């Protein structure tokens, strides 16, 4: 039996503890020994089990599984979109908030075209989202995070901020056909709960969790948008469609919202 083990080691080039039993399917003990070695190196990696559970999935499900487990602090859409504008923030999410918002300011001054990426970035990150609103439209700052984008579209005051919304429609990806405000409705819910409370300055008493929280901005938007009716009509229909989706995702737990954003992003 000693000779057999030596032979096995020479043939397989595997360093394994003797004695080896030779079965029809190779060295069972060898494979176990090797596995225990690899497991000992993996102990520090808490993602190993998650990784294995992901292996059972396919396609988008697998991708989502990886994204959930390998970026535990942030929805994956944020990780991806951070890379689109400033790659340096991909690695660290928490620092990403700071450098992201700085990156936005410099990009904003460079070109309006890159603002689409900004709006995509900030769909996932709540704090910079608030900053972007206050930088982008000063007069709308206190209206709440969701509404300024609707206002920009319906009032059409600033070409800059309007372009922000329009290109946000594409990069956000919640629905290619929707007008800007619609997509902001679909994409923002994740940030809504915090951002609304931070930026509202007491102007909107509604709680963002309740359907009423969305009702307020719509009514205001419609009354403001009366000046340019065609745009209002165009905006209004998808708004109602998205509104129900938005309410669903708001009323459910944050993980569902993250999933919804991953789907759209």
From Swiss-Prot:
Keywords: Cell adhesion, Developmental protein, Gastrulation, Glycoprotein, Repeat
Ranges spanned by the short sequence motif Cell attachment site, renumbered to the chain: 25-27
Region: Disordered, residue numbers: 71-265
Residue ranges, compositional bias (Acidic residues): 112-125, 133-144, 152-169, 194-212, 222-243, 250-265
Sequence repeat ranges, renumbered to this chain: 75-94, 105-124, 128-147, 148-167, 217-236, 238-257
Biased composition (Polar residues): 73-92
UniProt name for this protein: Protein ENDO16
Protein's organism: Strongylocentrotus purpuratus (Purple sea urchin)
